[in-house]
Amino acid sequence: MDGTDVTMLMREIGIRARAAAAELAFAEPSRKEEALNAAAEAMLARSDEILEANGRDLAFGAEKGLTPAMMDRLKLDAARIDGIVEGLRAVAGQPDPVGQVIAEWDRPSGLHIRRVRTPLGVVGVIYESRPNVTADAGALCLKSGNAVILRGGSESFHSSGAIHAALQDGLRQAGLPVDAIQRVPTRDRAAVAEMLRMVEHIDVIVPRGGKGLVGLVQAEARVPVFAHLEGICHVYADGDADLEKARRVVLNAKTRRTGICGSAECLLIDRAFLAKHGPVLIEDLLKAGVEVRAEGELAEVPGTVPAQPEDFGREFLDMIIAAKVVGGVDEAIAHIRRYGSSHTESILTENDATAERFFRRLDSAILMRNASTQFADGGEFGMGAEIGIATGKMHARGPVGAEQLTSFKYLVTGDGTIRA
């Protein structure tokens, strides 16, 4: 497909999306719920087709030499399809955010003012190897009254296509425009460049992928962007941490799934914790098969690898973690401010004052206490799914669910009211 063809294709998709968004903006909540539940049923009915398509994508990924972490992100199986289905049903069952009254007040002038949620319009989602993003993004945009244009990576091309077909089945059954959820039907990378320039047709871009993709989108987009560049998540084991809680959380935060953005990439251990318990957290990680890149006294633990300066502030997305000893919560905070990506940080402590200091003095999108960073997920937050984790400070932060995909407008009522 040459450049002219891609430009025309994307323009046509944009025009159709804008028309669908105008209709979705006032669609009844019951019809959106019906579409999502029908899409969930279609996903189950098409599961064999989806798995067959995923098999082709996995073969393509293996030929391209994708890393184990990327192959894990790409892979679908029966359990992951069930997870997608449950996510669709969960989003369907949530309150509809469109039209919700955020605030309401009266003015001495006699005006009654309401601030109510309204859809953004058209959302563009650009993602790499995770085919489940097709379902998550489609569902959340539909729930929030937005049309969406999906541009999946070449690795997940067939899987995304099969999932997209199920979503459109749901739209048809509910009598909603199928153009509400469109997928870019080409692997041509020129389509990404076109999306980033489509200010007339797209209201916001959400990139889901690695540092290269997100950095490209942030650098070149003329359309506003919700994004996080990297998930450099920290776990800090405080001197007042409960040992057994700390052992459970650290192992889960690193090893449950290493290829997701909520995976812990750096372990900070209070010197007081080390004095009480020794290097047990490091030993647990080593026994689990994690490569621990350790600094200072932790590098003396047998089996560790000496850390290099570039290991701190690095997103490994693998069975690798950086580790160092710090002299208390303030030193941990200083380290996170220097090396973190404003994604997710967790403190392990039984000391309320220390936890509060950690929460107040850090400004990452998600801060946790005695919990695994792997909970940094819209589904785990009760959103049903997420379209991404936003780490910026404008509009949306943290998991971006249906509510975060809305803006607002003011409804002002008077009674022949005039301004003096």
Swiss-Prot record:
Its EC number is 1.2.1.41. The keyword NADP applies. One of its GO terms (cellular component) is cytoplasm. Keywords: Amino-acid biosynthesis, Cytoplasm, NADP, Oxidoreductase, Proline biosynthesis. Catalyzes the NADPH-dependent reduction of L-glutamate 5-phosphate into L-glutamate 5-semialdehyde and phosphate. The product spontaneously undergoes cyclization to form 1-pyrroline-5-carboxylate. NCBIfam families: PRK00197.1 (NF001221), proA (TIGR00407). This is Gamma-glutamyl phosphate reductase. It comes from Cereibacter sphaeroides (strain KD131 / KCTC 12085) (Rhodobacter sphaeroides).
